[in-house]
């Protein structure tokens, strides 16, 4: 799989850009602030329908414009698939696949598979649980696009339940138990589906991350991944879905008084974490700076290998990564990604350690092939 053409209209700093991309290595060179990361952000948006840099779509639209438009041409399994996304903040995206309009995100998500590693990814190891939850969910929807709807349904159920709890907390009124039971059941069903998907993913992903860490670190240190939930483990391990739902409902009842007082949901996937261990200790507190970089790289490379094992090799993106790594890790990283069908790299300078391939110069949101 590779992206053969990318077009941007009014996306971030770009009024208009159109570029042809090769399979293999494509390197975008330019000083900071010239628009390199905006290019790869557009590629990620075509894959996941969300930015890896911002939680909302408004910053994606060029200042003074009403909408941003992305077009990508993907070559996969010997056929070309055209993807079109129109981003209008505050409204649903307009999506087209091969010229046909669709309202369903899952019809587009997963066609272009992308794994990106960026300096912000140090937060996967050092940061809050939200970054690790987003990491898991992004891999989930690329691996199994139908789970885009599962995640969206959970987020909707969480918003609705929180709105109900907030209204009770603010008004100080007697809670309507029948209404609470309805919201609890809706939430528990959505939570059970997402929890099951995440736990299965961690089980599949862990061996790939362990192998990637060994390659990046030169065999120094052993890593372990574990999904930590606010729902009791014995509930999550049950094979029967209805039993898991009942267990989540029981967990909600235990914290009901606190939830009603605070006006928010205290149990569920939105409060879970991916526990990262290095040599049997929490990586967040014990890993050195270099070890943390190796761990973050291993998480991305593990996701890449898992997706590749599923039959389609993702596009690998390295966004200003080489500047963050020492020479040894640069060499090891280059070795790990050398087999990628397409590799997109951004860099402020054309580093000697960068792989050989097509070079582009990016300056003031203009892109041209280097001489």
Swiss-Prot record:
ATP binds at residues 30-37. Pfam families: SMC_N (PF02463). One of its GO terms (molecular function) is single-stranded DNA binding. GO terms for cellular component: cytoplasm. Keywords: ATP-binding, Cytoplasm, DNA damage, DNA repair, DNA replication, DNA-binding, Nucleotide-binding, SOS response. PANTHER family: DNA REPLICATION AND REPAIR PROTEIN RECF. NCBIfam families: recf (TIGR00611). The RecF protein is involved in DNA metabolism; it is required for DNA replication and normal SOS inducibility. RecF binds preferentially to single-stranded, linear DNA. It also seems to bind ATP. This is DNA replication and repair protein RecF. It comes from Acidothermus cellulolyticus (strain ATCC 43068 / DSM 8971 / 11B). The gene is recF.
